[in-house]
Amino acid sequence: MGEPGSGAPVVLDGVVEQVLEFVTAAGLGAAGEYAASPGGAEPDLYGSADAAAIRYILSDLPADGATRDQWVAHLRSFQDSDGAFRHTSHNAFHTTAQAVGALDLFDAQPSHRLSFLEPLLAAGGIESLLDELDWTQPWMGSWTGAGSASALLVTGMADRAWQQRYLGWLAQETDPVSGLLRRGSIGQDSGTFFANLAATFHYVFVGEYLAAPMTAPEAKIDSALRTYTDGMLSADRSVGFAQGDWAYVLNRATRHTSHRGDEARAALREVALGVADNVLTHGIQGSMHDVLGVVTTLAELQNAAPGLLLTPRPLRSLLDRRPFL
C-alpha cells in the first residue's frame, strides 16, 4: 500500500511527522512564538499564525491551558491601534484575516475592534472596494476582497444584511461562461486564466463558510477541468497553494451539481497522487507559510479523494473552520 501513481492508498504518516518536526524547529521557545521558517531568530506574525493553522489541521493545537493563553497573547501583540495586523509580506487585509483566523482557532478575538475596516460596513462600502480592485491582477486582489470579508465575519462585525450585499456582488459579477471573477476581465491564456480561478477560490470559500448557494458551479467545474487538462497543475517541481486553490474550487463545486462528476473525481485523484508523490520525494521545505499551503492542499485532496491519502488522523479542513487562507 502506498505507491503514488498506482491508484492504491498512499500512506503519509512520515509526511505528517516531518511537518510537526518542521513546526517545532521554527519555534523560539516561548509558547506561540515562531520564526517565519526554521533557523529564524525573530518572532514572526505569519510564523505564529501559520503554525497554529498547521497544528489545527493536524489535530495538534492546544485548546486550553497556559500554552493556549500565551499563544493568544502573542498573536494579539501584533495588532495596531486601528485594529489592523500588518506584515511586510502581505497587505493589511490578508495579514489581518490570517491573524484573526488564527485567533479564532483558539476561540479568541483580537484585542481591538477592526476600525480600519468599518468604512466597508457602510452602504456601498464593500461594493466600492470590490469594484476598485485591480482586476488585471485578480489573485493578489483577492487578498483584499476576501481578506476584508473574512476578518469582518470572524469578528462578528458583518451582519446578515452585509453578508447578502457581499454575496450579491459576487453573484452579479461572476462570469457565466467560466464561473470565475470578474465578469468582463477573464484572461484566456493559461497563466491569466489560472489567476482568475485562484482569485475566485478566495471568494468561493467565503460563500461556502456562509453556506450560500454557489453561482455557476457547472461553469466552475468546466474551468477547473480546463486548467487540469491544460497542464497548469504540474506537481513535478513544487506543490502548495496553487493545487489547493484548484482542488477546493473543483471539490466544492461538485457538492452543488453532478455536472461532469466522474471527470472531476478522476482529476482530483490524479492531482492528489501527484501532490503525494512530490511531498514523499522532496519532503517538507520552505517557509511556514509554504508548508501551510502544502498541508491545506493535502487536507482538501484527502477529502476530495476518499480513502486515497492516509494520515494518522484525518486532516481537518482549515477553511471549514474559518474563511481565509
Language-model-derived ranges and their functions:
Residues 159-212:
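Active-site cradle of extracellular carbohydrate-active enzymes
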Residues 1-77, 91, 96-156, 161, ...:
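Terminal, non-catalytic domain-edge segments
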Residues 36-39, 82-86, 178-181, 185, ...:
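A cross-kingdom feature marking solvent-exposed beta-strand/loop segments within repeated
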Residues 235:
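Short, aromatic/basic-rich helix-turn unit that serves as a nucleic-acid recognition element
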